[in-house]
Amino acid sequence: MASYRNSRSRSRSRFRRRRGRRSRVRGRDARQGRSSRRRRRGKGRAHSGKKGRRSGSRRRKRNNENK
């Protein structure tokens, strides 16, 4: 009986692990391969431009107030 129970538990754990890993890996691959690359590139360009504009406007406002 012990050997039969062990074989059952092992097979169940394997199926659970495989299913979990497969689903997680698919999600990670899809995100990293497609969307994250596009988002990272887009964000880098957009934020770099916006940061410069924001800091410039803030500096001008401060200078005007001081003057």
Curated annotation (Swiss-Prot):
First and last residue of the signal peptide: none
Compartments in which it is found: Nucleus; Chromosome
One GO cellular component term: nucleosome
Tissue: Testis.
A biological process term (GO) from this entry: chromosome condensation
Keywords assigned by UniProt, alphabetized: Chromosome, Developmental protein, Differentiation, DNA condensation, DNA-binding, Nucleosome core, Nucleus, Spermatogenesis
Predominant location category: nucleus
Organism domain of life: Eukaryota
UniProt protein name: Sperm protamine P1
Organism: Isoodon macrourus
This protein's encoding gene: PRM1
